[in-house]
Amino acid sequence: MITATALAILPLAAACGEEQAGQQPGSGTVRVEPPVTGTKWNIATVTADGTTHRTKGDAQIAIDPKTGKLGGRLGCNHVNATATVGDGHITLGAPATTRMMCEASLMDTERALLKLFDGKITYRIDQNTLTLTSANGTSVRASAAK
């Protein structure tokens, strides 16, 4: 009888404390963050020179894991650059952009976003939000496209 009781209690005891990282307590599901590469990221805000701005236009980026290239739009112009992804950081090459002129707010967004390029930046993904931060203090928050 004691053996049967112990066997009945054992699975219950083992289940205690089995929440996994990224899992909401009691939800029964594990949140899986999108990877930094192969995901289209819609840029929501950019912080440069101590000021945060919501992006204007269609600002988005994606890193192709096969080619090691970043491509996207900076609000007005298209951008391409090499992108080497490491543990918690990305090394971006010098950007190549198209040269269209757009309204001033779009060009301001673009100038701020270009401050991320040509160097090593850190990245973090939390709740489908990508945060990029450069050594010069420029940071970007972007959400995974659906």
Model-derived features: positions:
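Lipid interaction determinants
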Residues: M1-K146
